[in-house]
Curated annotation (Swiss-Prot):
InterPro entries: Chaperonin_Cpn60_CS, Cpn60/GroEL, Cpn60/GroEL/TCP-1, GroEL-like_apical_dom_sf, GROEL-like_equatorial_sf, TCP-1-like_intermed_sf. ATP binds at residues 29-32, 86-90, 413, 476-478, 492. This is Chaperonin GroEL. Together with its co-chaperonin GroES, plays an essential role in assisting protein folding. The GroEL-GroES system forms a nano-cage that allows encapsulation of the non-native substrate proteins and provides a physical environment optimized to promote and accelerate protein folding. Keywords: ATP-binding, Chaperone, Cytoplasm, Isomerase, Nucleotide-binding.
Length: 540
């Protein structure tokens, strides 16, 4: 396919048009008085959102050169979302400001490489200063504030704070769509995995359709159990102890299953069998997790262990096990706390090394099950459109809160960036490098300016006053008052602000140093009909 090439100023101008189109659509959502954007969907109702990255991903421009510019800024939003989970609109606003200011200077004859060095120097200083003014997040109230600011909803803030308090910082918090109108929190204590009983005859509570085992022994094996003779020695020992038994195996079938069910129905012996969670290597790892949590051992032929020679000493224990049709929950496993801690650290080390998003998610789940528990926020709304929008906002708030726990918080509403202004302005640089520093200075004013404009105020007046205010004092666009931002609970996670600035600078530097842009040449339409076709006027 033929290509079209644009060079230097013409190329950069075309990309800037794309940058502006995307950024202008995204930045209207910034701040407490930001507006929504409606996205057309091929199927179903349109999506209403104020999430920067969701809007950015939807935008495709007709002109291929403009589209490249738009896609680069969409990359800023996407990268910030991947690292920090929020702050995508701020990142887009910063990138647009840096690109626009930078291109003005390049057009006036400045050297792009010099500007790039200046931008990198300024951003490094700004990031260091942000880390220096960052405050660690303490207590439920602070967590609730961060979440409430991100979701623009205090009720959501309280829910997320409660979820984090209940499952701990390593716990998993997931979002589900609720059947009702209200948004609620459901917390699963202990370790839960998605496998239920193999036979409904094993249930102990017919009303709830679940099997509840108090103080049971837990047999953990990766084998398929079908021969009852293999199980008999350990079953006899458990019966003598007068306690119930949970069997976690690849499968329990045939004679073994029939014997367990018959004994349960006769009231001789209470046992519940469930299939092992996961598949392949992940199954082995999860069985090992369960064994460590309950103080048992995995009975595996790979390790030279046989079922028929198993004793009670190899079984795990827990204070309670609840098995439903689809899930098994082990509460208060009797494992050694030091071994559990070592296992958690091992999973953390694997988390740091993995590059696969899927593996990361599964490791995070395993970590949560060992360390804390699982909280489910069930999102409710009156209509499907509202539900989608609300779910997106809560997802952002959740990510924002995790980022705050990780790296602390700074004053929100763009104030933190303005607080590092003087440090960046004090950088000693000359020539084009100094121009790069000035570009960053102009860009870090932009979030405050945009928040004020979205609230219907003159941005420049707010920016100038903020430069003269003492650190931490900022403009609350929701009320129109000047307040101590952190005291008022208007905060941003340091990680979000830092990532937005770094990613914006990275893409801006790429655009400024672009000298040629290559795109596919649009094919000219040579007419739809075949020129050799006869006239069809006489056809009915």
């Amino acid at each position: 396919m033929a290509k079209e090439i644009k060079f230097s100023e013409e190329a950069r101008r075309a990309m800037l048009r794309g940058v502006d189109k995307l950024a202008d659509a995204v930045k209207v959502t910034l701040g407490p008085k930001g507006r929504n954007v409606v996205l057309e969907k091929k199927f179903g109702s349109p999506l209403i959102t104020n999430d920067g990255v969701t809007i950015a991903k939807e935008i495709e421009l007709e002109d291929p050169f403009e589209n490249m510019g738009a896609k680069l800024v969409a990359e800023v939003a996407s990268k910030t979302n991947d690292i920090a989970g929020d702050g995508t609109t701020t990142a887009t606003v910063l990138a647009q400001a840096m690109i626009r200011e930078g291109l003005k200077n390049v057009a006036a004859g400045a050297n792009p490489m010099g500007i790039r060095r200046g931008i990198e120097k300024a951003v490094a200083v700004a990031v260091e200063e942000l880390k220096a003014i960052s405050k660690p997040i303490k207590g439920k109230e602070s967590i609730a504030q961060v979440a409430a600011i991100s979701a623009a909803d205090e009720e959501v803030g309280q829910l997320i704070a409660e979820a984090m308090e209940r499952v701990g910082n390593d716990g998993v918090i997931t979002l589900e769509e609720s059947k009702g109108f209200t948004t609620e929190l459901d917390v699963v204590e202990g370790m839960q995995f998605d496998r239920g009983y193999v036979s409904p005859y094993m249930i102990t509570d017919t009303e709830k359709m679940e099997a509840v085992l108090e103080n049971p022994y837990i047999l953990i094996t990766d084998k398929k159990v079908s021969n009852i003779q293999e199980l008999l020695p350990v079953l006899e020992q458990v019966v003598q102890q007068g306690r119930p038994l949970l069997i976690i195996a690849e499968d329990v079938e045939g004679e073994a299953l029939a014997t367990l069910v018959v004994n349960k129905l006769r009231g001789t012996f209470n046992a519940v069998a469930v299939k092992a969670p996961g598949f392949g290597d992940r199954r082995k790892a999860m069985l090992e997790d369960i064994a460590i949590l309950t103080g048992g051992e995995v009975i595996s032929e790979e390790l030279g262990r046989e079922l028929k020679s198993t004793t009670v000493a190899s079984l795990g224990r827990a204070s309670k096990v609840v098995v439903t049709k689809e899930t098994t929950t082990i509460v208060e496993g009797a494992g050694d706390s030091e071994r559990i801690k070592a296992r958690i650290n091992q999973i953390r080390a694997q988390l740091e090394e993995t590059t696969s998003e899927f593996d990361r998610e599964k490791l995070q789940e395993r970590l949560a099950k060992l360390a804390g528990g699982v909280a489910v926020i069930k999102v409710g709304a009156a209509t499907e459109t509202e539900l989608k929008e609300r779910k997106l906002r809560i997802e952002d708030a959740l990510n924002s809160t995790r980022a705050a726990v990780e790296e602390g918080i700074v004053a929100g509403g763009g104030t933190a960036l303005m607080n590092v202004y003087s440090k960046v302005a004090a950088i000693e640089a000359e020539g084009d490098e100094a121009t790069g520093v000035k570009i960053v200075l102009r860009a870090i004013e932009e979030p405050v300016r945009q928040i004020a404009q979205n609230a219907g105020l003159e941005g420049s007046i707010i920016v100038e006053r903020l430069k003269n205010e003492k650190a931490g004092i900022g403009f609350n666009a929701a009320t129109g008052e000047w307040v101590d931002m952190i005291e008022e609970g208007i905060v941003d996670p340091t990680k979000v602000t830092r990532s937005a600035l770094q990613n914006a600078a990275s893409v801006a530097a790429m655009v400024l140093t672009t000298e040629a842009v290559v795109a596919d040449k649009p094919e000219e339409n040579k007419g739809g009909a075949n020129p050799g076709m006869p006239d069809m006027g006489g056809m009915m």
